């Protein structure tokens, strides 16, 4: 099976102006700015309230849609890095190095915006499933090509795909000697090195 995951697209009704507004909102969230209502955001961005409601029906959905778009753009960067290699295990290493940036300080500002939104769960679940499936496909390919040992690829995919989010937990963060991103990259390397076939 080829390593391919289809990313869902934004509504085809969104035009260039809507995407520009989402870029502006992304920039706002990136700087740690907030807004209390859709009207407040419209004033800050100096646009009509109608334009915002054409993108999403509520403040919560607008935040979820924007963060979803940020994660998909980051996912494309990870896919591009992965596709520079022909070896499945090299693809996996490249993908995870970029994917683990999603628990870095910049992305933490975005994910914090979702912490109190119940409507964000389907989107977060979608991205987790996307990453897990991609990792499993790459592990399966690596096993077929004898690049890795005989392992449970599903369990390993769940582990590798969930490291970043696990270490981003506030309960664990204070006890880490490194950032969640660096810790995730370190353990990713240990795990992948441990499952690689030994060179004769």
Give the positions of each predicted feature.
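C-terminal peripheral helix-coil segments that are non-catalytic and often amphipathic
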Residues: 1-8, 133-144, 169, 174-200
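Helix-turn-helix
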Residues: 2, 16, 20, 24, ...
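A short secondary-structure junction motif
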Residues: 28, 73, 102-110, 138, ...
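Hydrophobic alpha-helical connector segments
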Residues: 65, 78-105, 156-160
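Amphipathic alpha-helical packing segments from all-alpha helical-bundle domains
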Residues: 72, 119-144, 154-158, 166-169
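All-alpha amphipathic helical-bundle segments outside canonical DNA-binding/catalytic cores
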Residues: 89-90, 126-127, 143-161, 178-182, ...
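Short linear capping/connector segments at secondary-structure termini
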Residues: 111-120
């Amino acid at each position: 099976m080829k390593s391919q995951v289809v990313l869902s697209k934004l509504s085809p009704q969104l035009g260039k102006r809507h995407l520009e507004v989402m870029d502006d909102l992304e920039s706002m969230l990136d700087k740690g700015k907030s807004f209390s209502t859709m009207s407040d955001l419209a004033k800050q961005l100096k646009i009509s309230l109608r334009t915002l409601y054409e993108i999403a029906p509520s403040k919560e959905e607008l935040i979820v849609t924007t963060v979803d778009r940020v994660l998909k753009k980051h996912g494309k960067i990870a896919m591009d890095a992965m596709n520079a290699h022909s070896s499945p295990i090299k693809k996996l290493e490249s993908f995870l190095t970029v994917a683990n940036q999603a628990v870095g300080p910049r992305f933490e500002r975005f994910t914090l915006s979702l912490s109190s939104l119940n409507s964000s769960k389907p989107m977060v679940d979608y991205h987790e499933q996307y990453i897990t499936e991609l990792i499993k496909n790459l592990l399966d390919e690596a096993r077929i090509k004898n690049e890795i040992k005989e392992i449970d690829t599903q369990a390993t995919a769940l582990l590798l795909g969930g490291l970043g989010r696990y270490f981003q937990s506030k309960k664990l963060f204070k006890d880490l000697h490194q950032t969640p991103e660096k810790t995730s990259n370190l353990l990713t390397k240990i795990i992948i090195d441990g499952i690689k076939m030994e060179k004769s």
